[in-house]
Swiss-Prot record:
Keywords annotated in UniProt: Chaperone, Cytoplasm, Nickel
Physiological role: Involved in urease metallocenter assembly. Binds nickel. Probably functions as a nickel donor during metallocenter assembly.
Single biological process term from Gene Ontology: urea metabolic process
Any one annotated GO CC term: cytoplasm
Gene: ureE
GO MF annotations in UniProt: nickel cation binding; unfolded protein binding
Family designation: Belongs to the UreE family.
Keyword Chaperone attached: yes
Compositionally biased spans, kind Basic and acidic residues: 172-205
Protein name: Urease accessory protein UreE
Localization per record: Cytoplasm
Renumbered residue ranges of the record's region Disordered: 138-218
Residue stretches of biased makeup (Basic residues): 154-171, 207-218
Amino acid sequence: MIRATAVRGQHRWTATPADTVVLDFDDRHRRRMAMTGTRGLSFLLDLEQAVALRGGDALVLEDGRLVEVVAAPEPLLEIRGHDPQHLVRLAWHLGNRHLPTQLMAKALRIRRDHVIADMVRGLGGKVVEIEAPFDPEGGAYAPAHDSGEAAHGHHDHAHHDHGHHGHAHHDHGHDHDHAHDHAHGHGCGHDHHGHDHHVHDESCGHQHSHGHSHKHEH
C-alpha cells in the first residue's frame, strides 16, 4: 500500500489532488492510519508524529500525488452573546473548563454538550445546535505542522459543506472529551430536546462524496 508521508498546509499547494479524504476533528489528528479516499484511492498515512490536519491541507503520497483533506461536519453548539464583551465572558468560561473551542468573529463553536449548553444559557448566552466542520484553537503550545513540508499556522480556513460522511473505525489512542468506539455519521440519533436546531456552515463549501478511513495503528 502506498504511503502518505508528508503534509502540505492549505494555500501551499496548487496541483489537482488525486483524491480526497473527509475526516472529522478526531481523525484529523493521527500519525498512522489506513485511509480510503472518496474516489477509492487507498493509502497508509504514515507520519513521523501525529499532526493536527485542517480542512484544505494536502497529504503527500510517496509518488508525489496529493490527497486533499476535507473537514467533515460534526454536531456542534454555536454560542452567541449579547455583545462582544459578553461573548468574551462566555469564552472565558469555556476556556476555564478546557473545552476545545472554535473562535469566530461573532460566535463560539464547541462540540455538542447539553450540560455546557445549560451553563451558557444560565450565563445569558444563546445556544443553537448546528452541524458544521469543527476547527478549534490549537492552543499556545500546539506546534505548527510541517511533517516534511512547509509549516503553516492558524488562520481562516476554506471549509467544505457536507451532508454526511462515512465511518472512521478505530481505537482512540488519545484523550477526547467524549470517549467512543467509532465516529458515526450524522444520520444517527442525537437528542435535541430543549434546543433550537438547524444546519448551516458560515464558510464556503462544495460537495464531496465521502470516503472511509480505518485505523491501522496509532
